[in-house]
């Protein structure tokens, strides 16, 4: 099932919040190994080096179309913040992630109940300032938000690096100052500023 908030296929170069989850409150990740595999999917889809190297699969590489700005992997799903050239590329990217993860899960003997039918939702954001607020929301989904390895917080606070992540889109707003971003994370005045509104289309 694919959902979005508004018809935007002709709008170029926008920020999007993507959410991928199992339906009916099922687990999306059964273990940290599953989360690690999903991160490897993000790297494979978004690394420019993967795009330029010889590829052994027919899956598309989205490095030229999508910049990953922030991410969060919890037991119940995936939140991604991206900058993309079009809604069409966002839809194709989300579907590829979901399809490849479904194939991985179906091959795992550790799963008693598969987390599919799953849903993929994408929400067009107003601008980089709304994207900054969303980055805070998805990082705070983790109890140990400051150090959780399955979110992108390390790219903002601890100088974590990778060519598949493009945190500079937001870091430029606060001069790449990790102390500023940490204080931003701790500032409760941002709570409730934005609410997600997803409408099935």
Question: Which residue stretches match the model-derived regions?
Answer:
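Short catalytic/metal-binding and nucleic-acid-binding patches
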Residues: 1-158, 164, 184-201
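Intrinsic, low-complexity terminal and presequence regions
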Residues: 165-171, 177
């Amino acid at each position: 099932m694919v959902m979005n908030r508004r018809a935007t296929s002709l709008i170029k170069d926008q920020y999007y919040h993507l959410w991928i989850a199992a339906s009916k409150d099922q687990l999306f990740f059964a273990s940290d190994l599953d989360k690690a595999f999903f991160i490897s999917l993000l790297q494979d889809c978004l690394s420019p080096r993967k795009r330029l190297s010889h590829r052994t699969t027919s899956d598309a590489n989205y490095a030229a179309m999508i910049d990953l700005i922030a991410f969060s992997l919890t037991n119940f799903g995936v939140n991604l913040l991206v900058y993309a050239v079009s809604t069409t590329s966002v839809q194709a990217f989300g579907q590829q992630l979901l399809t490849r993860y479904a194939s991985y899960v179906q091959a795992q003997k550790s799963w008693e109940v598969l987390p599919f039918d799953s849903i993929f939702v994408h929400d067009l954001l107003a601008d980089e300032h709304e994207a900054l607020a969303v980055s805070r929301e998805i990082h705070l989904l983790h109890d140990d938000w400051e150090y959780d390895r399955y979110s992108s917080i390390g790219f903002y606070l601890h100088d974590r690096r990778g060519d598949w992540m493009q945190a500079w889109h937001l870091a430029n707003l606060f001069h790449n100052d990790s102390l500023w971003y940490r204080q931003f994370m701790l500032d409760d005045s941002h709570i409730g500023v934005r609410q997600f509104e997803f409408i099935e289309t």
